[in-house]
From Swiss-Prot:
Pfam family, one: LOR
Purpose of the protein: Might be related to the phospholipid scramblase and tubby-like superfamily of membrane tethered transcription factors.
UniProt similarity note: Belongs to the LOR family.
Organism of provenance: Arabidopsis thaliana
Designated name of the protein: Protein LURP-one-related 7
Amino acid sequence: MADSETPYHPDPEDLRRIPVDLFASKKLPGLSSGDLGFADSSEHLVFILRKSSSSLKSLLDSSGVPLFSISRLHNGVWELHKGDVEKRKDLVLTVKRTSKRFSKTESEVSFAGESSENLVIKGVPFQKSCTIYSQDSIVAQTSLMYKLRQIYVGRSKFRLTIFPGSIDHSLVVAMVAIFLQG
């Protein structure tokens, strides 16, 4: 009986194996006009995507500190650098659109300095739907927020599910932002 009264403490290793859901919307509290916010299930703001221009964006943490700058180059090529837009530091990754058929888009993510691991993003930007693959496994996936008995599904809110693995959540959010901008 003494064993049943002791409180349960989950193993931190087990917690790292649980998928994380972030909810994206432009209407979260604390966002400026034009910002896209990513909140956890408790509606606490985790990341902010701020648009500087059509080709420049910044990914900020919840306190407004710049994590990455996202810049569009040409022909569907995007670069992700550490730091804010004015002080772009180290190149982290490059995203290149490899296929666009009708509404489906496919992009390849190449990490700077690492030629071994490339990711592939496949989906439909208009429907806020994409899946990020690392070889055979799914890294993350987005989907619109469906409700029961809802005929029309708005595209202003969507869910980002990040599956357990070795990729930082802020990188996944940046890749999704790049994919949706296209």
